[in-house]
Amino acid sequence: MVVEDSSSFREIIKYNLRDQFPSMVIIEAADGVEAFQKIDSDHPNLIFMDIGLPGENGLELTRKIKADHPDVIIIILTSHDSPEYREAAIRYRADYFFSKDALLNDGVFTLVKSILVKKGFNADASDSR
C-alpha cells in the first residue's frame, strides 16, 4: 500500500514497485481516512507512508495502524530526513525510515524483497498487498 498525498509521487512509487515486482497488488490512499478504510478491507502486508499527509500526519496514522495491525510493515517516506523525524518514526513504531530521495535506491527494493520473502511471498511473482 502507498499512502501519499502527492498523486505524482504516488505514481512514481507505484511505477517503481511494479517495475521491480510486476505482480504486486498495489493499493493507494491519499490521506489517513482513505488509508484506514482500505487497510481494513484490503489487509496490506507492507505500507509506504508519507509523514506530511493532510489531516492526520503519517506518524500518528502509523501509531494507530500498528495498534490495530501490529504485523503490517510500515516504511516511512519523507522529504524531512532529520534525526527528529527518525526518532519520532521509531516512537510511533514505524519499521523503516527513508528519505523520498532514497526511494529509487536499490536498497529500498532489496528491503521490500526481503520483507516479502519473510511474509511468505515469492518476491519475484508475488500477489502481496
Positions of predicted regions on the chain:
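Acidic, metal-coordinating helix/loop segments flanking the phosphotransfer/catalytic sites
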Residues: 28-46
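Acidic catalytic/metal-coordinating carboxylates
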Residues: 31, 57-60
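Two-component/phosphorelay signaling modules centered on CheY-like receiver
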Residues: 7-27
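Short amphipathic alpha-helix used as the core "switch/output" element in two-component signaling
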Residues: 37, 59-70
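Conserved acidic carboxylate
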Residues: 4
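As written
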Residues: 58, 90-96
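The feature encodes the CheY-like receiver
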Residues: 54, 82
